[in-house]
Amino acid sequence: MCAARTPPLALVFRGTFVHSTWTCPMEVLRDHLLGVSDSGKIVFLEESSQQEKLAKEWCFKPCEIRELSHHEFFMPGLVDTHIHAPQYAFAGSNVDLPLLEWLNKYTFPTEQRFRSTDVAEEVYTRVVRRTLKNGTTTACYFGTIHTDSSLILAEITDKFGQRAFVGKVCMDLNDTVPEYKETTEESVKETERFVSEMLQKNYPRVKPIVTPRFTLSCTETLMSELGNIAKTHDLYIQSHISENREEIEAVKSLYPSYKNYTDVYDKNNLLTNKTVMAHGCYLSEEELNIFSERGASIAHCPNSNLSLSSGLLNVLEVLKHKVKIGLGTDVAGGYSYSMLDAIRRAVMVSNVLLINKVNEKNLTLKEVFRLATLGGSQALGLDSEIGNFEVGKEFDALLINPRASDSPIDLFYGDFVGDISEAVIQKFLYLGDDRNIEEVYVGGKQVVPFSSSV
């Protein structure tokens, strides 16, 4: 007779689980049992030798255990802390200009098309499908200035089961493409409408995020009002900072009375412990100290920083200042929608900084793996809910099969000594793609392969 279990058990897996903790950048748990409640939370993760005890406690039979093959493993879902959903329409192209020219020539004209909800429906459906298929279980999305289209993005992420923050972009300055901006009053009013309608929907895993595009596209009045909206509704804030040198000089010219770029956001109520700022390539020590004091986060977007020749973020310096940091794809300045690409680029950028003697060491693959999972969850304030396989967290996970059909990975005899080796895990992180991601879970629910309803 087994004990009454609360909450009821939905899934039990036996096999290898790979995740990060704050003391260990990559922990490989071989031959373990993991149980998921029907509410999607992890209720146990123990060695398989404890099966009999767990079966009595949680009332499951051996036939209910799903056993992974010796070459498969689970890892936490990937967290994309910065991605522009509308820019997916031209991802993989048009990365031939520096940031400000790139925005004016490619980005703003593309985003203006999203005044059509039909365009939004098509592109947003595709970007959510594509990112989920590639293992992004949590995404922090920029939409456009169009409220209704941004609401469609939220609806689509909820329908597919992706965990997300969704932001309606705000910009009341844009002299170069004047048709793509709002008045200050419109931007504030539409942000309030966006937030109100999002909160009324009460999506379980999709939340609104206040989204001033960046300092060059927002007046002080707008920034201050957006900061107040975020404070009133206790919301997260996302924007960009110190992406390239030309941008930083333009901010100095536009707002000469402020000490630096960070000070503009800080003085206008936009730098809080619920703020995530993309890039930060050129933040000074003084600015990093302010980030740390405020509890604000940085989204490291190495593909975009390289593709647009913007800069090289020194992640070790950010971590030294105790600033929270995760990884972002930054589609479409970053040409890849894959967080695996972000992992690889982050390692390479760190290697370049070592080569140039900026640092005395580099980031390891294991440390970057942690940034893409647990680090990203912390940057978005979700580390008590997701990011690894700790008991009590929701089961956001990827089932990885390095031997999947048409896999880009070749495995050899030496890759296996009994259970899966760390070499196989590394091969997936460096060589793998969506063909190796056989199943994706968000909150305990399998969302990939996609159901017929989506």
UniProtKB/Swiss-Prot annotation:
Its cofactor is Zn(2+). It catalyses: guanine + H2O + H(+) = xanthine + NH4(+). The keyword GTP-binding does not apply. It comes from the Eukaryota. Keywords: Hydrolase, Metal-binding, Phosphoprotein, Zinc. The keyword Magnesium does not apply. Belongs to the metallo-dependent hydrolases superfamily. ATZ/TRZ family. Homodimer. Catalyzes the hydrolytic deamination of guanine, producing xanthine and ammonia. This is Guanine deaminase. It comes from Mus musculus (Mouse).
